Regions:
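Structural alpha-beta junctions
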Residues: 1, 12-15, 121-128
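Active-site-proximal specificity loops/subdomain of glycosyltransferases
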Residues: 3-39
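Short, solvent-exposed loop/turn segments at secondary-structure junctions
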Residues: 6-9, 21, 48-50, 55-56, ...
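Extended catalytic core of nucleotide-activated donor transferases of GT-like folds
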Residues: 22-34, 157-172
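Short beta-strand-to-loop acidic/aromatic patch adjacent to the donor-nucleotide binding site
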Residues: 39-51
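Conserved donor-nucleotide/metal-binding helix-loop-beta segment in metal-dependent transferases, i.e.
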Residues: 50-81
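Catalytic core and acceptor-binding pocket of nucleotide-sugar-dependent glycosyltransferases
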Residues: 70-156, 165
Length: 173
């Protein structure tokens, strides 16, 4: 089941969630719907394409407390609420990687959900963020367009997709 924004090509089960202009509230609203409908799920953003079964929790090489010091505004408030839940020694899981989720007590206000989930699960693997290090292909998933800045990289992405998936899947229109 897909919750949130639906790509044009997808024709499987879907629950639409109205978008919010505030990105943190938008993600929070989608998580609420997921928690109301599922006990466990794979949390990821719309620019990820899975290549294999996936259950690993990745955390950043940048500490969560360091991230808070380098940010401001609404994001800083969300990060501080997260720190209040997980504690000052929390590992930072806010990366552009999919993450396996199990239902947990979701606070009323937006938080950094992957950091809360990651600090609950344990057994993480430390990595650099693929988006900020322009890593296109991971052995388990493919990072989409936000990693790219030029047309030639977009073409490279399309070529990789065509090699990986020469035939349309049952979920494509």
């Amino acid at each position: 089941m897909l919750i949130g924004d639906k790509p044009l090509y997808y024709n499987g089960n879907h629950i639409e969630v109205e978008q919010n202009d505030n990105i943190y509230q938008d993600v929070h609203n989608k998580l609420k719907v997921a928690f109301d409908n599922l006990d466990e799920f794979l949390f990821m953003y719309d620019d990820i394409f899975l290549l294999k079964p996936y259950e690993i929790a990745y955390y950043s090489d940048i500490k969560f407390t360091c991230r808070i010091k380098r940010t401001g505004g609404g994001r800083k408030e969300v990060m501080q609420r997260t720190l209040d839940v997980v504690g000052k020694d929390a590992l930072n899981y806010e990366l552009h990687y999919p993450m396996y989720f199990k239902k947990f007590d979701l606070p009323d206000d937006p938080i950094c959900p992957k950091t809360i989930m990651g600090n609950i699960v344990g057994n993480p693997t430390q990595v650099k963020d693929c988006k900020h290090n322009a890593q296109l292909v991971n052995e388990k998933f493919l990072q989409g367009m936000p990693c790219f800045s030029t047309y030639s990289e977009d073409e490279r992405f399309k070529t990789i997709l065509e090699k990986l998936y020469p035939k349309p899947s049952q979920y494509e229109i």
